[in-house]
Amino acid sequence: MSEKELDSSVNNYVETKTPKNNIKQQEWDMAIGLQEVDNLKPSKYLEKLLQENVTGEKTIYEVEHELKRYYVEKDQSDEIVWDEFECDLVSTRIVELLEEDNFELSVDYIKYIHKFLFKDVYEFAGEFRKVDFSKHERILYNDSVAYGDCRFLEQSLDYDISLEKMKNYKELNMVDVINNITSFSSNLWQVHPFREGNTKTTALFIEKYLI
């Protein structure tokens, strides 16, 4: 399909409103889906709570409160499954951030997202890494992506964001919009400013940017 045909087909769509409970379910699907990057699965307790949130029985803040109480009890009996703990809390906080009506195209907001998601999970939540690292990827034949130099993480992100702020998407066709967003997302992710949680943080940052 040519760019002209693609733009034309997009313009032919009629906007419809998505029911609120469907939006809630989509937010949870995204939040839990992002945990699969680290092979994390939610607990049965979160699966119950999220359904109560989708149907409107509990707010997202009540869900987090219930989860914290649940894990305090688990900790006292030494029964915490830590992978589920991380998945449950981070998924819930992703949904919380998706519901927040705020966004700032800035390095500080990237730090804010990471700190918000991973407080109580990582002691370095919201802090840029101070060491360089590599990670062997099977998809790259055990080679590593060239992640950002730890000395210039803030500058690298600020540079990418500065370029993004100069773009006028109203002047671009749909193909160019998609290509530009893809490139921006990839550049942010490749910097990999945190020791852990980069993919989830970048994905949520871009999602908030696009809303």
Model-derived regions: residue spans:
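FIC/Doc superfamily catalytic core
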Residues: 1-211
